[in-house]
Structures are given as structure tokens and as C-alpha cells.
Amino acid sequence: MTKARTVGLDKEKAKIQNALGQFTNAWNEYGVSIVSDGWTNVKGKPLINVLGVSATGVVFLSAHDYSDKFKIDNNIGELLLKNFEAIGPYIVIQVIIDNAANCKAAGAIIEDKYPNIFWSGCLVHTLNLLMHDIIKIKENDYRWIGALYKKGKHMIRFITNHSNAHGIFRTHSKLELLKVGKTRFASYYLTFRRLLKVREALASMVSSESWQVLKDRATSTFDRRQFQEVEDTVLDTAFWKNVKYVLQFIKPVYYMIRFADTDKPVIGEVYEQMDSMLGQIKDIVDPKDPILYKHIHAQVVKRWDHLNVPLHALAYVLTPKYYSPSWLAKPAPGGMERKKPHTDSEVQAGYMTAIDKLVSDPDECDYLRSELSKYLSELGPFGTLHAKRDRDRVSSMEWWTMYGSPCPRLYKMAMRVLSQVVNSSSAERCWSTYSFIHSVKRNRLNENRAESLVYVHYNLRLLSHYCERAKTDRSYVTWDNNPEEHNLEDGSLTLERLEQELLGEEDDLAAAAAMPPPTCSLFPSDAPALPSGSRPPFASVSGGRAGVGRGSAALASRATGGDDTTPIVHRPREKKLEISRGKRKH
């Protein structure tokens, strides 16, 4: 056993390193993004993963124990610099690390030593923070959004933590209530969406005799109040209308997260996708509540300004499909007219800065600009009939492979820039691999041995996808079993599937939104109120005040996608919900 985890492991690691040559050698042509992220293992020790990501795949490079050091900018910067120097700093296009302040400072250290390397924040993390910002808008008129989420979370927590209530719920639903952690991407969207899916089951639960018996058996005033609050929420028509409304305007952010959460090189589409996301939100919110859209727009711009780097602008310009007449003719979401990327002043400033950063030699830069002018003006090889027809028919890299070689400098830059990723999800998926290998049952492994095991385990994943031997040799196929699963058939779920099970659910929001409200005779006499000053579009209020907080019945009809025939229940206010003011750590 000792030999297997020492000499044997070292030999296997060397074998994997040799096999990875077919991928790392391609970095000279395509460039590579160094992706890094930190976490804490089962021993409570801080670890930092470092991976190389390009169009050829994801290669695990190293993991480092930082238990003896603080995660300060100098230490992180030095760690990444060592990895750059090991693989060659001039094939590295960008480094993608966390958006935290110390990571940004580490990025500045890297850019200072190697001016040709870009620092980029993780797009998925940025979008997740954006969704958090939207839900937690602090303006008084929109604090109801955060209160709505807290109300839903309270209901989920009560049912799932109360075994008898949970048992009753399960008799009425095939789906579980999701207790989505704050660290999971798109947690707000997933929570609201699942609530909407199980709305009918929740209504059946609180209408059942079993629920009433359980509520009557509650011994303390606190428990009885908890049961009543859950029942009030389930039967509150305004609550469900507001959930649907919030889901509508955070759904574009969710889809943008799904778009960005990939190891594929999608950097050329980020600019346009962000514009489309904002336009979709505008189409949903602006006609009903221009002030809310103004607040959301400000949050989007703030996050984009923190993330946006010149490399994104250059990749946008080098994506041929955004110059095709068919794309330019389509109206953009939000009613904006589409135009060629390089004609946007912000994009132009960005791609010019990126070129100066990537090419330091003035003469080379002049040649490159001349070739770029031909591309933008559709001259030479870029003006042929086939080149124009294929702009939106093949991928960007295929297009450059077919038509870019007459302009070798621009071709090389396009292939290297368009091969890059936009997120650090690859590094985060190492957490699962590391936890399987270095679990509590195996915690006698030191960090070096655990790192070697992760190196072998993770990189076999890449080899299993692309090596011919892996298609016939079962030893390269079954390596990804869950080691804690006694049933080998069940344990063969890959770690990627385990990670993506929740986020990859089929989106049936449209069907859920069309679900009729529960038909039951239980209408509670009281319900928790929203904080003072909050005015959701659909509110249950009392004392002769309007039944709709903002807008009218027509507004309610547009927000729910149908006529507003469902009566709004009027109830006296009893208890105000507190708004969570906690900030997520960046």
C-alpha cells in the first residue's frame, strides 16, 4: 500500500504528464487561460487550485496548501507567477481568479511583471453577485423583493426541518423542496422556481386533514405561529404573483449564468450576451416599472464595469457572426438597433487597448492593425462571397481557420483570443474531486500526495474524452466512480453530473406560471406583512387601501400573462418581516 501511494503514484503522475503533451503542446497555437480558485479542505486547511484551460480542454496543474500563509495578494501573485513560468508566460493570455480585492491585487502584480497577460474576474461569479444585488435592492420601494425571498426561504426551512410536516408534503409532491445554499450559483432563481413548481402540492398539504391535526398538536405559541405563517404564505395569492414576477426579470441573469458556466471558449459572445440580457430585463420590467428597471440597470452596469476587460472587447470584434447582415437586421432585445462591434466607441477603445497589450513591438503592431483594417472593411480574403456567407454558419474559430491565413498576424491573435474561457468553474469542480480523494476517511494523506491523486484523477477525465485508448480500455472509463457509493452502478455517476444535476434542470417556468391558483376553502385571517415602505406589485393589504401596491389591475394582468381574475385576499397585518442585510463574501 505504501509503495502504491508513493513510487506507484509518482510513476502514474509522470505517465499522465506525458499523455497530456498532446494538449499542452497546442497551447503554443491557442494560448491558455490560467484559472485559479481557493477553498478549504476537510482538515480546515486553505487550498488553491491552478488549472490551464484552452480550446483543447482543461488540464489540472497544481494545488497549493496555504495554511501557513494568509491569502494576501503577494502570496497569490507569487503562486500564479510560478505556474506561468513553468509553462511559459508568453503563451498565457489571461488569468481568471476570484473577484475579491486581494485577487484583483494579485492580478495587478501579474500584469505588472507580464504586461501581455490580462486579469479577468470570473463571469459566473460576477453574475451570481448581480442576481444577489437585484434581490437585495435597498431602495425602500423595492425591499419587498428581498422580503419575498426571505419569506419563501422561511417556508422551505420550516417544512424541511419539521419531519412530520415534511412527511405530509412528500405525500403530495414528487418533487422535493430545495434548500439551496448561498454558495450555489443562481440560488435565488432555483429557490423561487422550485417553489412555483410545488405550489399546488403546498396548497394540498395545508388543506389536508393531516396538516390541521399537526398544527392543532403544536404545544408552544411559537410553533403555532410558525404553522400559521407557512399556511398564510401558501394561500397568499399575492405572494405567488410576486414570485412569478421576480422570476421573470431574474431569468435572463440565470440563463446568462448557464451560458457562461462552461469550459468552452465563449469569450467572443460575452459582450453581446450581456447586452441581450439587459435588453430582455428591460422588455420585462421597463413597461411596468421604469424606476425598478433603472435600479437593475445600475446594478448590471456596476458589475460589468468591475468585470469588463479589453480582452472581451477584442474577442467581440473578432467574432465574424456579429458582422453578418442577418444578425445586424434582427432587432436587439430592449428595442436597441444592432451595429457592427467596432463602431461602438466603448468597444473600439477596448480592442485598441487589448492589441497594444498583446503586441508590444511597434512594427508588429502596425502590421497587425493593417490586417485588422482589411477584416473590418471586408477586403481581401475577408470580402469573398464564401467568407461573408460563412460568418454566421460556422464557429468563429472555424471561420478564421478557413479564411484568416492570408493575414497571419491577425489570424494568430484571433485563434489565441477566441480560444479563451470566461469563468473559474473548472477550478471549483476540483473541490469535488479533492473531497472524494481527501475525505475524512483518507485524511492521513498529506497535501502533496492528495494533490498528486487529484492531478491523476482530474486529468484522466480529459484523457478519457479524447484518447482513442479510453474508448476501449475500461480502466480509463470507470475511474470516475464515487468512492463512497457502495452500489457501483449508482456510483458511476460522473462528478460533473453530480455537480450540474441541480443547475441543469429543464426549465419549465412557463408551465409553472400557467398553473392555476390552489382551489381550497382555507383563507387565513392574518398574514405577515412586508416591511414599511415596501410596495410589491401584488400585495395583500387591509383597511380600504388599494389591493395592488404599484400599478393597477392591468399591470397585474401583464405581469402574470393573463387576465387578473384571481381575487386579492385582504388581511390585517400582524408581523413585519425583517430584511436580511448580510452581504455575501466576494
Where are the regions a protein language model picked out?
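Short coil/turn segments at secondary-structure boundaries
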Residues: P46-I48, A63-Y66, N74-N75, G107-I110, ...
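Mobile genetic element proteins and their domesticated derivatives, centered on retroelements
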Residues: D37, G52, L80, V95-D98, ...
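Eukaryotic short linear interaction motifs
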Residues: N41-K45, G57-L61, D68-F70, A101-A105, ...
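Surface-exposed, charged/polar loop-rich segments
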Residues: I93, G107-Q212, P290-K294, R469
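Active-site beta-loop-alpha junctions of metal-dependent nucleic acid enzymes
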Residues: K11, A63-E85, T262
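C-terminal regulatory segments
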Residues: S67-D68, I93, L127, K138-D141, ...
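Core residues of folded domains in eukaryotic genome-function proteins
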Residues: N28-I34, G44-I48, A55-V59, N83, ...
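Structured nucleic-acid-interacting core domains from mobile-element enzymes and related host factors
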Residues: M1-V59, Y90, I291-V301, L307, ...
